[in-house]
């Protein structure tokens, strides 16, 4: 099975792909962005993709939400897993921290290490990279000039032959990233255990005071627990939003189905993004 992920080799996404059971038949396909990973499923270039959707420190991964919202309706969320994230400060060679001129990484990783960067590397310029592994690759290939460092995994440091200057630099320690599986087909409904349903909805142009409360009350009134809610701009101007919600249960469970049906009476649009087994 071809499995897309945010590349290059050495990213946390690649680590997450192989974190669960049954991975022996996976053919990993590194892709340049989260958007590309999702769209590779849409276009049939891979059967599945694993992409980050939220981090315990930095919150939602907007690229994932926006791609699902604006770019495709042909894929769905088919599973999830949670990966502990332990960032390292990495350089091509051992170097004193006060000599580092710049630190490069994915913006999510830089945000997760903001306190460390502010207190230990206050003079370093922060440079965005496409992924944590790409940041380590940049540092590994950089020759001459002032020393640069990257934020990434110990595995990436080993892969690119770099030195780990400090480990556990995320603030606070214990960061976790939730990843979701993207597929064209729904997971086997016969799987037992706890399930979740992800959906998105957006407000009508004539929304009135209390609109969002009424939407969410449809779940509370049926004792359906919401496990996540996020808002994103609809790109129609200031003050227009779409909302992403996860709830316990499957979309065809009676209480969940009734809540979604009632939600449609309030919202301009509702899309079920998928029902899937919850991570342990």
Feature-to-residue mapping (PLM):
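Domain-level signature for soluble enzymes in the chorismate/prephenate branch of the shikimate pathway
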Residues: 1-280
């Amino acid at each position: 099975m071809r499995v897309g992920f945010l590349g290059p080799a050495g990213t946390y996404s690649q680590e997450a792909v192989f974190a669960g059971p049954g991975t022996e038949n996976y053919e990993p396909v590194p892709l340049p962005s989260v958007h590309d990973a999702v769209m590779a499923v849409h276009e049939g270039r891979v059967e599945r993709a694993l992409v980050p959707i939220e981090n315990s420190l930095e919150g939602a991964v907007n690229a994932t939400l926006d791609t699902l919202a604006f770019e495709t309706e042909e894929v769905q969320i088919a599973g999830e897993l949670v990966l502990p994230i332990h960032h390292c400060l990495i350089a091509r060679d051992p170097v004193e921290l006060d000599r580092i001129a710049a630190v490069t990484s994915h913006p999510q990783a830089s945000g997760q290490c903001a306190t460390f960067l502010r207190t230990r590397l206050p003079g370093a310029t922060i440079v965005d990279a496409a992924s944590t592994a790409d940041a380590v690759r940049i540092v590994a290939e950089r020759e001459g000039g002032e020393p640069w460092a990257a934020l990434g995994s110990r595995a990436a440091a080993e892969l690119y032959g770099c030195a780990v200057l400090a480990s556990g630099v995320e603030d606070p320690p214990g960061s976790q990233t939730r990843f979701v599986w993207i597929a064209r087909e729904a997971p086997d409904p016969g799987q037992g255990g706890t399930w979740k349903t992800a959906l998105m909805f957006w407000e009508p142009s004539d929304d009135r005071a209390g609109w969002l409360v009424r939407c969410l009350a449809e779940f509370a009134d049926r004792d359906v627990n919401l496990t996540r809610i996020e808002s994103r701009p609809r790109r129609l101007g200031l003050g227009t939003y779409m909302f992403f919600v996860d709830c316990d249960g499957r979309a065809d469970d009676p209480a969940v189905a009734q809540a979604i049906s009632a939600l449609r009476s309030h919202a301009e649009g509702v899309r079920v993004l998928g029902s899937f087994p919850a991570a342990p």
